[in-house]
Amino acid sequence: MNPSTTQARVVVDELIRGGVRDVVLCPGSRNAPLAFALQDADRSGRIRLHVRIDERTAGFLAIGLAVGAGAPACVAMTSGTAVANLGPAVVEANYARVPLIVLSANRPYELLGTGANQTMEQLGYFGTQVRATISLGLAEDAHERLDSLNASWRSATCRVLAAAMGSRTANAGPVHFDIPLREPLVPDPEPHGAVTPPGRPEGRPWTYTPPVTFDQPLEIDLSADTVVIAGHGAGVHPNLVQLPTIAEPTAPAAPSGGNPLHPLALPLLRPRQVIMLGRPTLHRPVSALLADPEVPVFALTTGPRWPDVSGNSQATGTRAIVTGTPNPSWLDRCAQMNRHAVAAVREQLAAHPLTTGLHVAAAVAGALRPGDQLVLGASNPVRDAALVGLDTAGLRVRSNRGVAGIDGTVSTAIGAALGYERDHHGRTVALIGDLTFVHDSSGLLIGPTEPTPRQLTIVVSNDNGGGIFELLEQGDPRFSDVSSRIFGTPHDVDVGALCRAYHVENRQIEVDQLPAALDEPGSGLRVLEVKADRSSLRQLHAAIKAAL
């Protein structure tokens, strides 16, 4: 037999049996056995293969595929720096709990330290950022032991899948699956050159691991004036729906009858306790409240970890067992303040003479329809969506909130669209800033033979730099002589020309044209650019706060 080819075929077969539906492949020589096996699986309709040149963008494409489809995704690459380029995506997948499998080919381990070409100590490279690091070891040329080797390879692959999906931990995340491969790296002439020893009957995985039930009920008395802060990964809590809730855009939409609370209304209220769902990261008033030692915090999460930046959490669990009844006057007061904050934002946006990222976010939010998927950039766009009162009912909202970097967002959006379209008919809209777009512009490179989103519109709010810094301490007017260069980083990139280089449909429009443009029938991938101003952002946000 051809050991490397046989091993690769077994691994790919077992990944598919374990639920992998999409694999991103980056070209290389050492991973050729995996590439041939993946191509065969793609041709037979067992997986969908996506070939990319850049491993960094490939990793984020896989993240998007995983979150869009709700299934583990795999990215395969050759040895050396190809593996290192997965670092940012692995870190994001770790903190966002995305089931990402890094399937790396390696040189035979005896070549480590010898000066062999394209060889590095890649096993264990990702350290604490992965749920597990698993190696198969070199495939032996021992046909008489094929049944034993088959069992070993399939068993290890199932361990990879269980770790990635958190089947025994309730803590999904990235896994590094490293496979050293010895030549020959290409299949022998068929029919006798390579075989695929069988897996379990009826397509079952070799080792089935049922999902763990992670349940820690926590008793909470609602008679105290309570607010709910719902962040990324909040989960669904129907028995808390009547409470005033500041929900970040990526939190699941509340069932009908919810009680939304605008984040800017929070400083106008005096809550006596907080129920924190998931991991909130967006709003400074929220951070200040969570850090108040006079306000008890109850943290409810869907996994074993819970956020507690200020060390102020009084108790943790996975769901609330409620006692007591909320004070009606408190609920009325919160609803009143929510209406006041929403009106203040709307009025100040209408009065502001220049188009800003907030205006672009408001236009996008108003143009969405039930069944859509929305992908938000991790800098201002996700915050702007929250501030303009995005209604997430009927939407799927995604954003890389694990470590909240802007890198890989274009690729994440493309992956999310491809993943979502597997089982849904809705379109995908992405709202990102210009720096985010430029940073991952190579993500637009989709080869002519590769799957392309059925309907993805990327809206680029282009204020020629980092608008978020206008709102931070670095944007204080006393730093005006240097802040634009070292924080704003203007670039003057021609977004249209960049899109044309990648053969991506694009046009520049005004913000008032955006709703109609988003409503146009169409297919494929396109970019809509809206020019925006960042120099007046500080003034606009100050006006909104003053109106409160």
From Swiss-Prot:
Its EC number is 2.2.1.9. Pathway: Quinol/quinone metabolism; 1,4-dihydroxy-2-naphthoate biosynthesis; 1,4-dihydroxy-2-naphthoate from chorismate: step 2/7; Quinol/quinone metabolism; menaquinone biosynthesis. SUPFAM superfamilies: Thiamin diphosphate-binding fold (THDP-binding). CDD domains: TPP_PYR_MenD, TPP_SHCHC_synthase. One of its GO terms (molecular function) is manganese ion binding. Pfam families: TPP_enzyme_N (PF02776). Its cofactor is Mg(2+); Mn(2+); thiamine diphosphate. It comes from the Bacteria. Binds 1 thiamine pyrophosphate per subunit. The keyword Cell membrane does not apply. PANTHER family: 2-SUCCINYL-5-ENOLPYRUVYL-6-HYDROXY-3-CYCLOHEXENE-1-CARBOXYLATE SYNTHASE, PROTEIN PHYLLO, CHLOROPLASTIC. Homodimer. This is 2-succinyl-5-enolpyruvyl-6-hydroxy-3-cyclohexene-1-carboxylate synthase. It comes from Mycobacterium marinum (strain ATCC BAA-535 / M). The lineage of its organism: Bacteria, Bacillati, Actinomycetota, Actinomycetes, Mycobacteriales.
